[in-house]
Amino acid sequence: MDYMDREGHRIKKTTSQDKFLKFVYTHTATRVLMRPLLLPAVSRLGGKLLNTKVSAVFAGLFARAHGIDLNKYEKQKFDSYNDFFTRKIKAEERPVNREDTVLISPCDGKVSVYPIHENGRFFIKHTPYTTHSLIRDAKLARHYMGGWAVVIRLTVDDYHRYCYVADGEKTYQRRIPGIFHTVNPIANDICPIYKMNSREYCCLLYTSDAADELDGV
């Protein structure tokens, strides 16, 4: 995938995971074998296995493979693989601007920004969406017309916690059921998997001077 860093330099990054998934999604036999693995029950079972102490051995291997500096986090040893992915970063590594007129970033990731209008589309991991097709709520989609969609894509090396972007109150939350394809965009080059994936979002009413937001998709 291509990225642009903060200095405007273009970075092309292809991982071993990208290569493996491209093989899986471009061959009929492997796609058929993969179907049972996409079921929510299988995903839940995998989650339980990655909560075991035995799975903790993969945390250090993963950190080294992806150049993750564990000294930036509050602890360097983990009880499980999932414990590693929910690790908490040291406060000084993510200073927060608390001015009422500022929206902070909700998470680490690669950022794209799109205007929201009636016939407009924006892209999430190579998949085109309208506001309505993403959140499946026509009334709420109309509310955001004229605004901006800020899409932040986390990759495996990013910090996997997120926060609200300003002070306020969560007023609405919705889960859209679906299946559990990989979130790697390589797979989406073969078929539009993200429109089939389960997802969840919430609406936040802010008490600061910042605009209201749709969060967590």
Model-derived features: positions:
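Catalytic-core "active-site belt" of small-molecule-metabolizing enzymes
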Residues: 29, 33, 37, 142-205
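Buried, small/hydrophobic-residue-enriched core segments of structured protein domains
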Residues: 2-69, 148, 156, 160
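Extended, compositionally biased flexible segments
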Residues: 52-135, 141-142
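Conserved small/polar residues in nucleotide/adenosyl-binding loops
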Residues: 206-213
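Short, flexible micro-motifs
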Residues: 112, 181, 212
